[in-house]
């Protein structure tokens, strides 16, 4: 009777194994199929077959002779399911937990251990595995899948403890996860073992590459390029698919750039470009490298190529029905040097760099292309500036207007400003309520007054370029009126305002007022009305004491009006200011405002100040 039972059991085991092997072959056939729909259908059928087989095996009491096959089927099911879904879920963790419980059932160790977590279950199973050598290969495959799941979930502490237990290390002897992964030595697969989609050694190689890359990239992001190098070299030398190798080489290039090795950086970036069609990250890094080297032409060419590359649809290969390196990498991080953003974000970088480097004509064209790209897709939402990498839509409009004015296209700039006003002026009646919300700390400081005021400022400058002095003065006055009307009289400090944001906004407001007052003052000077100009320059000094240009224009006007004593006193004040530090310098200004301030910064300032110093009485000489 027992022989008959054994024969029946052996026959069932053979049938289950044949079914597993057939389903694995079916999945591999699907993997090599060029037809997407057929590929997906074959893989899905194989997955359902494995699910049914696993259900049959786990419907019986756990038995050591059957467990190697059961664990193999579990691993094949998890691998195929994760690859089809392109990610891990809680279901896979439950599948692993159920398998561990089944192993312990054979050792009569189930009991209260069911209440324990996965890590505790693994400790128990690995301690029991010395009594079950026939399960060793299957358990190592299951370890590989558990490691993949924990790595993708960033549970590195649990993963390190699992590998320590697996390697027989002393608890706490090594927390170097890379070293623990290298030390892990999966047993060789037996020739007559059930077929698997991926063996333990293959999983180890994937884990080693994925973790080395993750660790290197994290060190690079946190500002430790020297530490990142060794991990990235480890990733490059491992089982590294070409798309990942492009990223690894780009990260290595970024490390060497930050460490002051531009030639090595360039070699890695060239290697990255040769590895595949994912040209975005290496081209962006190349633009940073050329900017650091001061090669503006090469920098802008790299950015232009990047814009074109981002316009080409990505031709991603169909994923293998395996646990791949890409499956274990973290989602894109905005702080990562490999994040090149969208085509519009890159177009903005190109346009702004052209503006900053004096290529106004190119900047104007790039900004107009950018606005067409943004406005064509959908109605953009106007909101406060987000975190890097780019400004909000109104600031893009303002930067574009600056580029047009600088390129001598004042009429086009006026048209653009009118478009911006039509989109933002409707918000102005709500400003008093928005400022009140900001004062109470319930909402962020509103940026709309800055945008609308800056628009009138740029319109004024465009009219100056067109020779319409009266209209220009009117626009500068409108800018000032809005600034003084919109600014809250009392701003509570402390909890009501984010300090950094408040300081940046205050600096921008001060500099915007100074720019409008100086611009209007210069028009009064041009029309021979020095007294009115003096009033504006005096007010600009009061409004923005950290702006040296305000002192210079005031000093020039006082000298023209022959108010010698006041001019001398102001000169001494300016000298004292030169030796001090100013808070305004700590806060970056919007690009459109920086560009505008450079227009009203007199080129002969230093020569005039030196001439004025030499004209002072001897007792005033330094």
UniProtKB/Swiss-Prot annotation:
One of its GO terms (molecular function) is damaged DNA binding. Changing residue 546 to R: No effect on HES1-, nor FANCA-binding. The keyword Nucleus applies. Highly expressed in testis and thymus. Found in lymphoblasts. The modification Phosphoserine is found at residue 7. TPR repeats lie at residues 246-279, 344-377, 453-486, 514-547. One of its GO terms (cellular component) is nucleoplasm. DNA repair protein that may operate in a postreplication repair or a cell cycle checkpoint function. May be implicated in interstrand DNA cross-link repair and in the maintenance of normal chromosome stability. Candidate tumor suppressor gene. Belongs to the multisubunit FA complex composed of FANCA, FANCB, FANCC, FANCE, FANCF, FANCG, FANCL/PHF9 and FANCM. The complex is not found in FA patients. In complex with FANCF, FANCA and FANCL, but not with FANCC, nor FANCE, interacts with HES1; this interaction may be essential for the stability and nuclear localization of FA core complex proteins. The complex with FANCC and FANCG may also include EIF2AK2 and HSP70. When phosphorylated at Ser-7, forms a complex with BRCA2, FANCD2 and XRCC3. This is Fanconi anemia group G protein. It comes from Homo sapiens.
């Amino acid at each position: 009777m027992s022989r008959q039972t054994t024969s029946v059991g052996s026959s069932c085991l053979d049938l289950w194994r044949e079914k597993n092997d057939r389903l694995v072959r079916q999945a591999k056939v699907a993997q090599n199929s060029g037809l997407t729909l057929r590929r997906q259908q074959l893989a899905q059928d194989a997955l359902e077959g494995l699910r049914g087989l696993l259900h049959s095996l786990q419907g019986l009491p756990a038995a050591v002779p059957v467990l190697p096959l059961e664990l193999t089927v579990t691993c094949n099911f998890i691998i195929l399911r994760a690859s089809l879904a392109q990610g891990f879920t809680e279901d896979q963790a439950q599948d692993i937990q159920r398998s561990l419980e089944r192993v312990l059932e054979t050792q009569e160790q189930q009991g209260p251990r069911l209440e324990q977590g996965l890590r505790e279950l693994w400790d128990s199973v690995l301690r029991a595995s010395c009594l079950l050598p026939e399960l060793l290969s299957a358990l190592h495959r299951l370890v590989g899948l558990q490691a993949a799941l924990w790595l993708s979930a960033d549970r590195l502490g649990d993963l390190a403890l699992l590998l320590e237990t697996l390697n027989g290390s002393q608890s706490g002897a090594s927390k170097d996860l890379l070293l623990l992964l290298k030390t892990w030595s999966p047993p060789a697969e037996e020739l007559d073992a059930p077929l698997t989609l991926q063996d333990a050694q293959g999983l180890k190689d994937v884990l080693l590459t994925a973790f080395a890359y993750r660790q290197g990239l994290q060190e690079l992001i946190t500002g430790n390029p020297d530490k990142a190098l060794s991990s990235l070299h480890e990733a490059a030398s491992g089982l590294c698919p070409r798309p990942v190798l492009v990223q690894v080489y780009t990260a290595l290039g970024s490390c060497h750039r930050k460490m002051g090795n531009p030639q090595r950086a360039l070699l890695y970036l060239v290697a990255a470009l040769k590895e595949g069609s994912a040209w975005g990250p290496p081209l962006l890094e190349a633009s940073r490298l050329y900017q650091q080297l001061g090669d503006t032409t090469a920098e802008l060419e790299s950015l232009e190529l990047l814009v074109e590359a981002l316009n080409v649809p990505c031709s991603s290969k169909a994923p293998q029905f395996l646990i791949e390196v890409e499956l274990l990498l973290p989602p894109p991080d905005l702080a990562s040097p490999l994040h090149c953003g969208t085509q519009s974000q890159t177009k903005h970088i190109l346009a702004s760099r052209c503006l900053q480097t004096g290529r106004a004509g190119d900047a104007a064209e790039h900004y107009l292309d950018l606005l067409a790209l943004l406005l064509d897709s959908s109605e953009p939402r106007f909101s406060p500036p987000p975190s890097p990498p780019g400004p909000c839509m109104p600031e893009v409009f303002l930067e574009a207007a600056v580029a047009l004015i600088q390129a001598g296209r004042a009429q086009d700039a006026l048209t653009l400003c009118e478009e911006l006003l039509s989109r933002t002026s409707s918000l102005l009646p709500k400003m008093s309520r928005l400022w009140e919300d900001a004062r109470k700390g319930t909402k962020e400081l509103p940026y709309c007054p800055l945008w609308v005021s800056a628009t009138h400022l740029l319109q004024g400058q465009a009219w100056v370029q067109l020779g319409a002095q009266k209209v220009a003065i009117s626009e500068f006055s409108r800018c000032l009126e809005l600034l003084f009307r919109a600014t809250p009289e009392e701003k509570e400090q402390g909890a009501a305002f984010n300090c950094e944001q408040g300081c940046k906004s205050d600096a921008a407001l001060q500099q915007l007022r100074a720019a409008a007052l100086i611009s209007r003052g210069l028009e009064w000077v041009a029309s021979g009305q020095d007294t009115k100009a003096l009033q504006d320059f005096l007010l600009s000094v009061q409004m923005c004491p950290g702006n040296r240009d305000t002192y210079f224009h005031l000093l020039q006007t006082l000298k023209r009006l022959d108010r010698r004593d006041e001019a001398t006193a102001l000169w001494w004040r300016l000298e004292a200011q030169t030796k001090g530090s100013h808070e305004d310098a700590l806060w970056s200004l919007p690009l459109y405002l920086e560009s505008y301030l450079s227009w009203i910064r007199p080129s002969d300032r230093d020569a005039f100040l030196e001439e004025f110093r030499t004209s002072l009485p001897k007792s005033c000489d330094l």
